[in-house]
Amino acid sequence: MFQPLLDAYVESASIEKMASKSPPPLKIAVANWWGDEEIKEFKNSVLYFILSQRYTITLHQNPNEFSDLVFGNPLGSARKILSYQNAKRVFYTGENESPNFNLFDYAIGFDELDFNDRYLRMPLYYDRLHHKAESVNDTTAPYKLKDNSLYALKKPSHCFKEKHPNLCAVVNDESDPLKRGFASFVASNPNAPIRNAFYDALNSIEPVTGGGSVRNTLGYNVKNKNEFLSQYKFNLCFENTQGYGYVTEKIIDAYFSHTIPIYWGSPSVAKDFNPKSFVNVHDFKNFDEAIDYIKYLHTHKNAYLDMLYENPLNTLDGKAYFYQNLSFKKILAFFKTILENDTIYHDNPFIFCRDLNEPLVTIDDLRVNYDDLRVNYDDLRINYDDLRVNYDDLRINYDDLRVNYDDLRVNYDDLRINYDDLRVNYDDLRVNYERLLSKATPLLELSQNTTSKIYRKAYQKSLPLLRAIRRWVKKLGL
């Protein structure tokens, strides 16, 4: 149930109003970020949204220009960060990557680290909640924002229901959540063997509808993920890889879509979310046990509804909270400490015991090679799938032919036995025939001679009578 999660997030976003009407300036360099338009993507992030509540931000990508902070992540051209020597480098990731504090002064990530004031745990799901909160500032949305929240300040839109008719219906109790498809799956990265294996195992029990490029069953990729997910009782939301604390946006998408998440990725996910509100595959010894539990929920109405309507967050004294009390205040305090500290750790000669620049220069080359290998892998995978289909067809044909051969073999053996029996009978009859024929030949010869003699005597006896008849006929003139 997403509404309690939204309420808790909005509450975590509450901050005191600034005493001054003119926020201090903050120059931020974006070394590398997601997407082709890095500046634009950074402005869409929750980090920019939070910092803009306290600072007047100027963004740029010029290493020769002054920066209060420079942000970088392990994706894209990682070596760009090396060009920013005299600025405080902040690592931020949405992947299962740990920060290198020899290259970055500060870091924001998934790991549960304690590195004084240099690290903040802010999983990617917190950023996704920011986007969800923005999306429901809409008069037709089934989820409601508090009137005094930061997300309710802008003029609301009026198109949510038009784009999410099924989601609105199921959240507003206008349709039965039990009368939905079994499970959904949306993924674009095929290089996730655990996730793929679980999908195959679950799909063998009950069909799982795939709407992404991996294990797609629709014939096309869905464009509206949340509307798609809302049409199913469960959502298979495995992470690409496993890592303690590595909880991304996937579980948030399931909660938002009013479907039960089937989760795997962070073994410690129960610290972030209420274990009664989702299926945690890490809780089971193997896939079979997890699937048995999913089947139980699927077939037991009350158990399913209890989990569906659970608060996604853990509670303390009846109040929902984010793990480690994550909030806008905590994030702003983290950056306040950074800006007030003049130390640039990556430039400390005592930290550098080896040259770290040289290995980083090769990262881009390695990434190019990786992309090439990835393309080759995808091609090979397609060829493998085609060959597999052909093999399966040939196997089916072979099995059919084998069955036909076995049937013919049985029939042949039966016919052979019958033939052998008939042959024995034929030989016996032949012997009997020849024996009878040898005995009957003299009798036949005797019979023929006797018959001839009888006919001759009868003819001789009838001659006088025949002659008398002939004379009588002549007299009568006939």
Swiss-Prot record:
It is an enzyme of class 2 (transferase). It is found in: Membrane; Cytoplasm. Keywords: Cytoplasm, Glycosyltransferase, Lipopolysaccharide biosynthesis, Membrane, Repeat, Transferase. One of its GO terms (molecular function) is fucose binding. Changing residue 246 to F: Loss of 95% alpha-(1,3)-fucosyltransferase catalytic activity. The record marks 95 as: Important for catalytic activity. Its EC number is 2.4.1.152. Changing residue 240 to A: Loss of 90% alpha-(1,3)-fucosyltransferase catalytic activity with an 18-fold increase in affinity for LacNAc. Substrate binds at residues 94, 186-189, 195, 222-225, 240, 246-250. The keyword Cytoplasm applies. Residues 434-478 are annotated as: May be involved in membrane binding. PANTHER family: ALPHA- 1,3 -FUCOSYLTRANSFERASE, ALPHA-(1,3)-FUCOSYLTRANSFERASE 10. The tandem repeat region, which may form a leucine zipper structure, is essential for dimerization as well as for enzyme stability. Involved in the biosynthesis of the Lewis X (LeX) trisaccharide of the lipopolysaccharide (LPS) O-antigen. Catalyzes the addition of fucose in alpha 1-3 linkage to Gal-beta-1-4-GlcNAc-beta-O-R (LacNAc-R) type II acceptor. This is Alpha-(1,3)-fucosyltransferase FucT. It comes from Helicobacter pylori (Campylobacter pylori).
